[in-house]
Amino acid sequence: MPPLILLLSAAHPPDDMRVVRKEGAALAAAGFRVLHLCPGPGGRLPPVAGVEIETLAAPSRRALWRPLWRRVLALRPAAIHASEPDAWVLAVRAARRLGARAVLDVHEHYPSRLDARLPAPLRPLARLALRAALRAIAARADALVHAKSGLAADFPGHPRQVEVRNHALVPEGLPRRAHGPGPLTLLHLGAIGVKRGWPQMLAALSLCPAKTRLLVIGRFTDGSEAAFRAEAARRGLAGRIELAGWMPAEAALARAAAEADVNLILFQPGEENHRLALPHKLFDGMALGLPVIAPGFALPVAEIVQGAGCGLLVDVTRPAAIAAAVAELADPARRAALGEAGWRAARGEWGWPGEAARLLALYRALLG
C-alpha cells in the first residue's frame, strides 16, 4: 500500500480548494494515499479528487485539538501536511511520536494577523513575538511549503522551503465566458467582508449604469451581511444585487461562466496579507476568461494582471476609479481581449501544473 499523507486542518473545510483540490489531488494522482482530516459533521465524507475525507465534530476550534491528536496517532501517517499554525503544533508533535515527516503549509503572513486588533505602537512587538513562535515550530518540521512569494522571509535558515503558489487549477470541461453587448454583471467570488471591499463595491455600483448587476457567490466571513443589505437598500441597489451564498466549486464556476462579465477583487490596503495576496478568485476568473478589476497595491496580483494583460489595476479605495474601470470594460471587444489573455495565462505560465510538480518533488524526496 502506498504511504499515507495526512492533510491536517484545524479550520479548513473538507473540500478546501488549496488543501484538497490542488495539493491533495496532485499527490493522489501521483500515487500517494491522501486523507484530509478536518472539522466537519463527523465521520467520513465522499472522496474529493481522489482525496479521502474524514471529519471530526467539535463545539469549538480549541475543543477539536484532542480528537485531532488522537486520530492522527491512530492513522499513523508517513507524512503530516498541516495547514494552520495550531495544526502545525499538532503535526510536529505527532511526527516526532510516530517517526513521520512534518510539512507545514504557510498560507499567509501570520506575524501580522493581530495587527487589526492592536494599537499601532504594539504591532511591531506582536509581530516579533509571533514570528519567534512560528520559527520555533517550523524548526522542528521537515519542510515548509509557501502559498505565495514573500513568506519565506519569516523563516530564515530553514533548509527545506518550497513555494507552491495558488495558481490556476483548470478543471476539464470548464465553461468559458462568451462576451457580448449588453448590461454588465459584476462578480465577487469567494469570501466577502468589509476589508474585502464591499463598501467600495456598492459605492462603485451606484456610479455604474442602472442596468449593471452584481453577483456575489460566497459567504460573508466577518458578520457584515446585514450591514451590506442595509447599505444596498439605502443606495437603492437591492434589486440589482444577488447574494447567491456559498456554492460548491463546480457550481460556482458554472454560474460565473454563464452570467458574469467582470471579476472584482477589491480587498483594501492596510493589511500585510492583502499586500501579499494571491487569491484563488483571481485564477478562477482567468480560467473562465473574465477580465479582472484588481488592486494595484497587491504586489503578486499586480504582477500577474500586468504580466498576463488580463485586467485593470485601480485604486480600490476610490469607488470612482472602480466605476471608471467598469465603464472601460463595457466594450465587449475589450473584455474579450483581456479575458482571452487571462484564459491563456491560466493554462500556461500561471497554471497549477508547475506548482504541483514542485510539491510532488518535495514529497518524493521526503518519502523516497
What does each model-found stretch correspond to?
Residues 6-8, 145, 179-205, 215-216:
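Conserved donor-binding/catalytic core segment of Leloir-type glycosyltransferases
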Residues 12-18, 196, 249-257, 263-283, ...:
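Nucleotide-sugar-dependent
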Residues 25, 66-73, 93-97, 104, ...:
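Membrane-proximal helix-turn-helix segments that form the acceptor-binding/catalytic region
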Residues 39-42, 214-228, 245-246:
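Glycosyltransferase donor-sugar binding loop
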Residues 54, 127-175, 242:
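Donor nucleotide-sugar binding/catalytic pocket of nucleotide-sugar-dependent glycosyltransferases
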Residues 226-256, 262:
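Nucleotide-activated donor-binding/catalytic signature segment of Leloir-type glycosyltransferases, i.e.
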Residues 307-319, 326-333:
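Conserved acidic donor-binding segment of nucleotide-sugar-dependent glycosyltransferases
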Residues 317, 321, 333-363:
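A charged, aromatic-enriched C-terminal amphipathic alpha-helix characteristic of glycosyltransferases
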